[in-house]
Amino acid sequence: LLKHTFSQFGVQTTFVDAHNLNEVEGAIKENTKILYLETLGNPNSDIPDLDALISLGHKYGLAVIVDNTFGTPYFIRPLEHGADVVVHSATKFIGGHGTTLGGIIVESGKTNWKTGKFPTLSTSNESYHGVAFADAVPDAAFVTYIRAILLRDQGAAISPFNAWALIQGTETLSLRLERHAYNTKKVVEYL
């Protein structure tokens, strides 16, 4: 996605070792807009220093987007660490049964989208009555833009049945993850 799909839209991605802050900082360029990271890296489940990376991103005026698919909101809450946007693949733990493709985007409401790095959000959008999303909804400019423009133009919306299936998973999320934690503790104690 980041390397191949986004490049088709003119988005360049630089991959770095998230455990090497000097490497991360060295990769930040004048045109860098986003620092994207995972709370639990795939495929190794490595855990980066979330606070240090978020602080570094903000030092350079970047929006920090955290993929919390494997961390889940039950175990890790990136917004409490200062992340600007958190994304989840709802297909995995949130849905809990792997039958439905879906995702979640949560915005902190604290991001200044008017820094000059995000003209899509901070300037007038003629296809939406001239609205500048960062002015009209400063606490939710990113998610409102996605909903008002990207959903309208690209149609990435799940069916009502799939939405229902994901809701079924959220009803047992805390119970399932509590059990995961309990079982993990037992395995660690045994080893």
Question: Model-flagged regions — what are they?
Answer:
Residues 1-191:
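Conserved PLP-enzyme active-site core in the AAT-like
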